[in-house]
Design a protein with these regions (language model features):
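N-terminal secretory signal peptides
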Residues: 1-21, 29-34
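Short, well-ordered beta-strand elements
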Residues: 47-58, 80-85, 108
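Extracytoplasmic/periplasmic substrate-binding proteins
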Residues: 56, 116, 217-221, 248-349
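Extracytoplasmic "Venus flytrap"/periplasmic binding protein-like
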Residues: 68, 72-143, 147, 172-178, ...
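Helix-loop-helix "hinge/cap" segment bordering the ligand-binding cleft or interdomain interface
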Residues: 75, 132-134, 149-217, 226-265, ...
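Hinge/lid segment of periplasmic solute-binding proteins
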Residues: 113-166, 188-191, 199, 218, ...
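Conserved C-terminal helix/tail region of periplasmic/extracytoplasmic solute-binding proteins
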Residues: 175, 390-391, 400-464
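C-terminal lobe and pocket-closing loops
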Residues: 287-301, 314-428
Length: 464
């Protein structure tokens, strides 16, 4: 290519960057020039841009929806190959850690809000403001956006879909007990009635997951419901506060109503226990509907049997708190520039209404739309599963509207900015504290101090 051709190409690139030349005109002119210059040469196949994207939705229906969206994207972008892979969060966490250690991250992935804080501080991800603005910042629930917009004014991720944890109870276990869950407001109300719902070994009044990741969920939610937090205003552990001590005492009082071996149960075991009638209540999500359809008798697969019960507050709390599942897409800074640009193009395509609806409909009561308008759209609300489980849908929407659905370990909104929140979440320290008290009878104040000291010594101390 001669100097004249080089100057012309540079001018095209400059005009494209300045926005004076549209994408289509830029590509058309560039292609025409390339054709003239390359005419005498033998044609070669264009190398595709391979984009690796990991998400946390391995559900077969969701994989089918993602596959269809990717195929439609490929029809429009023949120079890009999207390699989409779904896996559970535990597998994702391990795979991401290995990829980071090897300095070979994917182009983009789902992650947790607390991981965004950590990755942002370490320079591992980059902002996605252009994606948020392209799909319509003003169209998205503010309570979805708030957790990923940082003090620098930038969005460091975009939530793929959301859900809020709800307290589920078996309505068919209430007759003859005198229990009215809708009257519950406090932990004392709950503790008063749990004995009436406990019929071992047939079923237990409550089931909880004892795996550390899920124990962390209950720690920060119950801390928040008792007016406290895992952290103080300076980001230091607040585990010796009266609110946390009270939360641990509450957990001890729940133990008689939990099934044997609960401390080794994972989240899926608790859902199946509720669906099969082995537990009267559970902390659950919208995807639990699938377990009900799989395990419960046909005549019980409805919200009259599988009810929404209110979450309660501790003696120092003012409002209950629930977990917000808002795993965001993030773009990794070390990925090649062309891959990052292609990943952003795919995300813009993914969030187009006709594509995004297919994705959300794959798990209709759990993968909830980030767009406000969908919750006023009859075609969205009248999906058969959303109609069947309308009380579940309404309960989740209410949590978002009142602003009491927070991401993992975020009892207070400012907690999301704590640099080591991800390291605390990844450690077993909080779960060890709970098990020491609930399973081994350790004094809550002693266990809380030991956990606090570990966080200061092993996490905060090493972060400085």
């Amino acid at each position: 290519m001669g100097r004249r051709d080089t100057a012309g190409l540079q001018r095209l690139v400059t005009e494209r960057k300045e926005g004076t030349l549209g994408r289509r005109e830029f590509l058309t002119t560039l292609a025409a020039g390339a054709a003239v210059v390359a005419a005498p040469r033998r044609a070669t196949a264009q190398k595709k841009i391979a984009v690796t994207m990991w998400d946390t939705e391995p559900n077969p229906a969701t994989r089918a929806a993602v596959k269809a969206i990717v195929e439609d994207f490929h029809k429009l972008h023949k120079d890009i190959e999207i390699r989409a892979e779904g896996m559970g969060w535990g597998d994702m966490d391990r795979k991401l850690q290995a990829a980071m250690a090897a300095k070979s991250p994917p182009t983009a992935s789902h992650t947790q809000s607390y991981v965004v804080t950590s990755f942002r501080a370490k320079g591992l991800i980059e902002p996605v403001d252009d994606v948020v603005k392209a799909i319509g910042e003003d169209k998205i629930f503010p309570s979805v956006l708030r957790w990923l917009k940082y003090p620098d004014g930038k969005y460091w991720g975009i939530t793929h879909a959301w859900g809020a944890e709800i307290f589920g109870g078996r309505g068919d276990y209430l007759p003859g007990t005198g229990v009215n869950p809708q009257s519950w407001r406090t932990w004392d109300d709950l503790l008063r009635d749990l004995p009436k719902l406990n019929k071992p070994p047939q079923y237990y009044a409550l089931t909880l997951a004892g795996i550390p990741f899920f124990v962390n969920e209950d720690v920060y939610m119950w801390a928040g419901a008792n007016g406290g937090s895992v952290f103080d205003a300076k980001g230091q552990p607040a585990l010796e506060s009266p609110q946390i001590i009270g939360m641990l005492e509450f957990w001890k009082k729940l133990k008689p109503f939990l099934p044997p071996g609960w401390s080794s149960h994972d989240y899926l075991e608790t859902l199946s226990a509720w669906a099969t009638g082995k537990a009267a209540s559970v902390l659950m999500w919208g995807r639990t509907a699938g377990y009900i359809d799989q395990y419960a008798p046909p005549d019980k697969r409805n919200p009259d049997v599988f009810q929404v019960w209110p979450k309660t507050i501790g003696p120092m709390g003012k409002a209950p708190l629930t977990q917000f599942d808002n795993e965001p897409w993030v773009i990794y800074a070390d990925a090649p520039a062309d891959e990052k640009a292609a990943a952003k193009e795919f995300l813009k395509f993914f969030f187009k209404p006709e594509n995004y609806r297919r994705y959300c409909d794959s798990v209709p009561v759990h993968l909830l739309s980030i767009f406000k308008a969908d919750f006023k759209d009859s075609s969205y609300l009248n999906h058969a599963e959303r109609k069947r489980w309308k009380p579940w849908l309404d309960a989740q929407l209410k949590w978002v509207e009142i602003g009491r659905a927070h991401p993992l370990l975020v009892s207070n909104p400012e907690d999301v900015l704590i640099p080591w929140i991800g390291d605390v979440a990844a450690s077993p320290i909080l779960a060890d504290m709970v098990m020491a008290v609930v399973e081994r009878g350790r004094d809550p104040k002693v266990a809380a101090k030991e956990a606090s000291d570990k966080i200061v010594r092993d996490i905060i101390g090493k972060a400085k």
